[in-house]
């Protein structure tokens, strides 16, 4: 049975995770940022980040830190929103994205978090640019796989 170290800069998110996974005793919870992890080097077999890399202040620094804390032979996996190559799907997605803040305001009374979400997705780098950054920051055998027509992608790389 392995251990899971969950890191998030948002205390409320960690509290939600603790509630959801209260029956698991192999998870530790840490407030922190991907750019400055408080773990020793060469510690982890896997490093995963989901829908968080685009929210970091410095993507390269975050990738360097991920590489640092991975053991040699460790694998980096990143699930993130990406760029859609199919023009028809992209057209539909862009128009759907315009209504997300309105729906958010209707459901939760706030549109700002959803406006931020759409802007952060729009300004995030594309799949090939992320592969390039992963390579520049020490990862090898980097690749990605589009899911849901490219709305999201899983990026993978190894510390050799």
Which residue stretches match the model-derived regions?
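A short acidic, Gly/Pro-enriched loop at the edge of an enzyme's catalytic core
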Residues: 35-47
